[in-house]
């Protein structure tokens, strides 16, 4: 069975690791899992290096993209079940926070929320961890072999009548068939267009100030 993940951001890398852990390893069926990503996934790439490559958009592999993340107890439990060493790497890259404070753009305090939660196996409370988006991505990406990530931009995904899926590439290279495709390629997802071909662009896109 061939599984293709589109996008090597946090979601794509996490999906890859989950599949590797939970897919059955016994029996006659074998699994091939490949990630296609349009941008560089080098662990140590910097924003300046990306500018030198003249790439218009940014991605998870850029040190400055996405700012910070607050990972709650439920998210930390997911990381723990996946790999305890992964959880430790993420915690070490950030800091714990017992409260989550929301403020207006003028700095006024709007609400303060308890940011602790219970673990799944014990009654011990777990604090939220605040970390950079890149450090979270880096911890996931470092556990994926380089040869399982292919740097290619996908132009179209087609669901075929025979049950297979066909992936076309922007560079015109030969198309690839896959039994299962996981779309982890962001809000302007190419994979999503294959499922909802008639869907229009978001009429109310987010506005960042």
Predicted regions and their residues:
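Glycine-rich FAD pyrophosphate-binding loop
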Residues: 8, 20-65
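Conserved N-terminal helical subregion
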Residues: 2, 61-66, 70-209
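A short acidic Gly-Thr/Ser loop motif
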Residues: 7-9, 186
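Extreme N-terminal starter segment of soluble prokaryotic enzymes
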Residues: 1-4, 31
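N-terminal Rossmann-fold NAD(P) dinucleotide-binding loop
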Residues: 12-13
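Active-site catalytic pocket residues across diverse enzymes, especially alpha/beta-hydrolases
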Residues: 19-24, 195, 199
């Amino acid at each position: 069975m061939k599984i293709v993940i589109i996008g090597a951001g946090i979601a794509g890398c996490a999906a890859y690791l989950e599949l590797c852990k939970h897919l059955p390893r016994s029996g006659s069926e074998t699994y091939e899992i490949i990630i296609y990503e349009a941008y560089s996934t080098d662990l140590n790439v910097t924003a300046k290096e990306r500018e030198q490559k003249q790439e218009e958009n940014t991605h998870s592999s850029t040190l400055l993209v996405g700012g910070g993340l607050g990972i709650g107890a439920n998210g930390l439990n997911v990381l723990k079940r996946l790999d305890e060493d992964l959880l430790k790497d993420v915690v070490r890259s950030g800091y714990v926070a017992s409260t989550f404070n929301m403020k207006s753009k003028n700095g006024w305090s709007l609400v303060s929320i308890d940011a602790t939660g219970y673990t799944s196996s014990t009654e011990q409370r777990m604090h939220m961890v605040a970390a950079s988006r890149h450090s979270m991505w880096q911890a996931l990406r470092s556990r994926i072999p380089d040869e399982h990530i292919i740097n290619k931009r996908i132009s179209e995904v087609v669901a075929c009548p025979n049950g297979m899926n066909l992936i076309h590439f922007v560079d015109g290279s030969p198309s690839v068939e896959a039994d299962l495709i996981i779309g982890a390629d962001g809000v302007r997802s190419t994979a999503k267009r294959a499922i909802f071909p008639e869907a229009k662009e978001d009429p109310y896109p987010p506005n960042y100030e």
